[in-house]
Amino acid sequence: MICTLLRAVRCTERLHGCPGKPWFLPHSVPHRACSQTEPRWRWGLQEQNTTARPRCIWGVTQRSIWTQVRSPQSAKEDGSKQVSVHRSQGGETVLSTSQKVKEAGRDFTYLIVVLIGISITGGLFYTIFRELFSSSSPNKIYGKALEKCRSHPEVISVFGEPVKGYGEVTRRGRRQLVSFIEYKKDGLKHMRVKFYIQGSEPGKQGTVHLEVKENPESGEYEFRYIFVELEPYSRTIVVEDNRS
């Protein structure tokens, strides 16, 4: 009976895969306790079943200890990660510097564009002022010559009142452009202007030719001559002639 139980215990240990010596040896068990060994062997089997779990738990504990043993290596990895972070922070610093350089270049480009826009706007304002308000502008000279033609009696008698003036005809049919030519002679500026006049008399239209010369003392233009040429007729009206 005892031998059968011992064989059962060994088979159980082999099935559980537990290394080491068996719990109870045959020579260590007294013969007088043979009648009471069956419960004790059963208790031993139960104890073996219950102690198998702690061995598994012990295996987990060994694994945790092995992980803790590797903790210095993980600490080194953490250190390397910190170093990489510092390097990345250094990279960010370099990147921020490049961004500052790019922003500075962009601001400089915007400044150049603004300056170019200001210069173009200033040139346009200067041209508009010169064309409209300056005494040496072609439009200003055109206005003065037109007033002289309107007040001339021969022009009024031929064309009738009111006398209107206009410039060259554009592609859209507008009469706004006044043709002129600027040149220098004897160190003085000259300008020749041409425009057209028309009165209340139907079918009569005239072409005004004039020339101005710069006054060396005042710097303003003075009329040299103003002629009105009748297109349908070969006739010329002299409004003003200061060439002599």
Swiss-Prot record:
GO biological process assignments: mitochondrial cytochrome c oxidase assembly; mitochondrial respiratory chain complex I assembly; protein import into mitochondrial matrix
Transit peptide: 1-18
Keyword Protein transport: yes
Signal peptide: none
Domain of life, source organism: Eukaryota
Assigned keywords, A-Z: Membrane, Mitochondrion, Protein transport, Transit peptide, Translocation, Transmembrane, Transmembrane helix, Transport
Region (Disordered): 69-89
Protein's cellular compartments: Mitochondrion membrane
Topology relative to the membrane: Single-pass membrane protein
Transmembrane segments: 108-128
GO cellular component assignments: TIM23 mitochondrial import inner membrane translocase complex
Family named by the database record: Belongs to the TIM21 family.
Known role: Participates in the translocation of transit peptide-containing proteins across the mitochondrial inner membrane. Also required for assembly of mitochondrial respiratory chain complex I and complex IV as component of the MITRAC (mitochondrial translation regulation assembly intermediate of cytochrome c oxidase complex) complex. Probably shuttles between the presequence translocase and respiratory-chain assembly intermediates in a process that promotes incorporation of early nuclear-encoded subunits into these complexes.
Subunit architecture: Component of the TIM23 complex. Component of the MITRAC (mitochondrial translation regulation assembly intermediate of cytochrome c oxidase complex) complex, the core components of this complex being COA3/MITRAC12 and COX14. Interacts with COA3 and MT-CO1/COX1.
Protein name: Mitochondrial import inner membrane translocase subunit Tim21
